[in-house]
Amino acid sequence: MAALAVNKPGAGVDSGRQGSRGTAVVKVLECGVCEDVFSLQGDKVPRLLLCGHTVCHDCLTRLPLHGRAIRCPFDRQVTDLGDSGVWGLKKNFALLELLERLQNGHIGQYGAAEEALGISGESIIRCDEDEAHVASVYCTVCATHLCSECSQVTHSTKTLAKHRRVPLADKPHEKTMCCQHQVHAIEFVCLEEACQTSPLMCCVCKEYGKHQGHKHSVLEPEANQIRASILDMAHCIRTFTEEISDYSRKLVGIVQHIEGGEQIVEDGIGMAHTEHVPGTAENARSCVRAYFSDLHETLCRQEEMALSVVDAHVREKLIWLRQQQEDMTILLSQVSTACLHCKTLQQDDCRVVLAKQEITRLLETLQKQQQQFTEVADHIQLDASIPVTFTKDNRVYHGPKMEIRVVTLGLDGAGKTTILFKLKQDEFMQPIPTIGFNVETVEYKNLKFTIWDVGGKHKLRPLWKHYYLNTQAVVFVVDSSHRDRISEAHSELAKLLTEKELRDALLLIFANKQDVAGALSVEEITELLSLHKLCCGRSWYIQGCDARSGMGLYEGLDWLSRQLVAAGVLDVA
């Protein structure tokens, strides 16, 4: 652009004045950071900062960010950026209007128009009559470039005035000559597939050459059609570029929100200072630390409670064992005294006869004490181990077996009693309607299930609620072979799940009689009972089974055990 401001030799005083004016215009239109000329669009669009200075878009994107703000490179004033970043800053429309007017040649006939052409990136064409002037028209007859003044002077006669003169933008393209027949211009395009590598042809090629008889079209319409498709493609590319740029800006904003950074803020007296703005990553880490800190505190409290339970159990056991020690010591002393007395009596026959009743009483006392010792010894397990089991909520249970209360419910004839006795005695029991309830204890691994089997007839169902108290798990049995009773089972299960006393109870559904031909599958029963909707927010599981063979029953107990007992302690004896 500086070259455009240099006065040409012979340009005169006016040319020098116009050149200096063009230089001043260019200086106004330059970015003060990169010294490149502003443009109407693209990376060199002028944008306004809060302080009033104008910087091109490209330089603004290169400025260091302070949180969500940038500093003016000239006066260091702060400008806050919104969610759109630099793209959200206002354009300098006064400069844009000036640029547009310069490119349209509205400012000055020579100097400013010349500068505008330079700004727009086009080559400057000099007037063929006077090189100090810039050409603005083209004479198609004379084939010369002329400025408006020289065009009037050279074509002032009647003959020359008839020459067609067009603006430079409408200047016809020079015809390309055929490489085979150099005296003929290319006028046609071959449309044959085999000729697409060399489709251009002149009239000789068309009539007599290698393109003879080929389908063809006229060069200019074909070029215009391709040119239109190129313009469409360029428009699509611009749209696509804008989409990519917008997406990139969003990515930059998201990265800034994730990483956080420094933000420039003003205090009460107007002094600017930086402060740290935490990103979403730091907030997430803080949430994790807070969660695990609370978890550690909760675990510490649960550990203290569990240790207090174990300590109390150990203390009670030691007190009882020491009491037994004292009792055994007293018993041993009494036995020793009786033996010594008997030994003393047997030394004299007369004394033995006289002490007969006393000896009889001693023997009876010893027999009673021996009987008591035998009974106590049978019930005492001399085992120093202290077995413990942990529940899912980190509570500790001491003892060889953890007791679980289970209620088995379902429609009549579903197989509840058959399942109970198969688990208890491992034998099949013929179906008999349950009048009232059955209760059995089933030991499985280190768990002891106390299972209450309640009758499922219509008149007994209102009594189910009396068995809900302290129930830890509900086993609901469904007859898979009776499709017509599924809706009735769904209704009873829905009522069951509304009970407050069963709010925290586990739900195990046995799809019984899977061995019967035509029985509903587990998936079909799940859908017909709407289990995903009905049991939302509750721990539940459905297990296909056959009460006759026992298939699937222990898989159900396994699921119950895993839900009730912490992982890794199921097999601890």
Curated annotation (Swiss-Prot):
Positions in coiled-coil regions: 351-378
E.C. no: 2.3.2.27
Cell location: Cytoplasm; Endomembrane system; Golgi apparatus membrane; Lysosome membrane
Zinc-finger as UniProt keyword: yes
Major location (coarse): cytoplasm
Pathway: Protein modification; protein ubiquitination
GO CC terms of this entry: cytoplasm; Golgi membrane; lysosomal membrane; nucleus; plasma membrane
Gene3D superfamilies referenced in this protein's UniProt entry, alphabetically: Classic Zinc Finger (3.30.160.60), P-loop containing nucleotide triphosphate hydrolases (3.40.50.300), Zinc/RING finger domain, C3HC4 (zinc finger) (3.30.40.10)
Function recorded in the entry: Acts as an E3 ubiquitin-protein ligase. Plays an essential role in autophagy activation during viral infection. Mechanistically, activates TANK-binding kinase 1/TBK1 by facilitating its dimerization and ability to phosphorylate the selective autophagy receptor SQSTM1. In order to achieve this function, TRIM23 mediates 'Lys-27'-linked auto-ubiquitination of its ADP-ribosylation factor (ARF) domain to induce its GTPase activity and its recruitment to autophagosomes.
Protein's UniProt name: E3 ubiquitin-protein ligase TRIM23
Annotated organism of origin: Rattus norvegicus
Gene: Trim23
